Amino acid sequence: MRLGSRAAMAPPLGNDLHTVRTEHRHTRRSLLAGLAAFGAAGALGATGCTRVASSGKNGGDLLDRLRAQGVVRLGIAGEIPFGYIDRDGNLTGEAPELARVIFKRLGVDRVQPVPTEFGSLIPGLNAQQFDVVAAGMYVTPDRCEQVIFADPDYRMPDAFVVRKGNPLGLHTYADALRRHAKIATGTGYAQIQHAVEAGFKESDLVIVPDQVAGLNAVESGRVDLFTGTAVTVRLVARGSAKAESTKPFVALVDGKPKADGGAFAFRPTETRLRDAFNAELHKLRRSGELYRIVRPFGFTRAEMTTLTAKELCGS
């Protein structure tokens, strides 16, 4: 999952690498090219009146407007497994599927994707290009100054893609540093910070566009490992004849274990919508339905969490 300014219900991925790569091409390139018109048309069409600014009085009135319109626009960034368009042109992913269930309970029948680059999600949200960020976005103190978050729906450790058999014995960043391993990770990924905290120089990291490029780098021997979120790594390494994923581990940041939590983001004026969303999220968490919704996207019970946005925002 991405950290910086650029920072993821049939099963979303097949059981082989070809499917992962095919899905990825649809979510990175054709998502923006093929659906830009769709997203723009939707934003200017039936949902256009959601562009009316809310004063934030009494927590904002966006929830009422969404109920009246029957549709909510979701900002997505085309990242498997968090929020993307599948091979058939359908919106799916951990966050959109969860959004469908929660907004249905809130009286909003439909969700509509608005594809954008990851770094444009928060600016686009605050510019009212869409109503909520549904991209599995990590909750960080910096982001908490720009948007308000629901409580996290998952907590994610790191993992590596390594060559089959893990010949260098790479299980943590400390292992990688000791073995002088060459590391690749994705553009804007939180794992850049995690590797730097472990002692790597950022200039020594190989930055690739995405997890598929990272897998290719490991398979070709250009790097010793690719690091990403545990779920991303599991999915991209599945079916590879030359690479495998390691067990998840929690990185150390400022000397303390840190597993990031991903959540939905809302405009700061829309506390009423955020609170209503949170109430339904907590019900799903307690009933176990939350896990059943996200499990098809590669999530495990170990990645479910009771963390709050307040904890992650640092206030």
Q: Model-derived features: where do they sit?
A:
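Extracytoplasmic small-molecule ligand-binding "clamshell" domains
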Residues: K57-A135, E145
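Short loop->beta-strand "edge-of-pocket" segments that line small-molecule binding or catalytic clefts
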Residues: V71-G78, F82, Y173-Q191, D224
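Periplasmic-binding protein-like
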Residues: R155-V161, S240-A279, T300-S315
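A ligand-binding cleft/hinge motif common to bilobed small-molecule-binding domains
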Residues: G136-E145, V196-E197, D224-K258
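Flexible hinge/capping segments at coil-to-helix
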Residues: R65, R163-K182
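Extended ligand-binding regions for polar small-molecule ligands
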Residues: T50, P96-R105, N166, A174, ...
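N-terminal secretory signal peptides
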Residues: M1-H26, A37-L44
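Ligand-binding cleft/hinge of the Venus flytrap
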Residues: I85-D86, A99-D109, Y189-P209, A237-K242
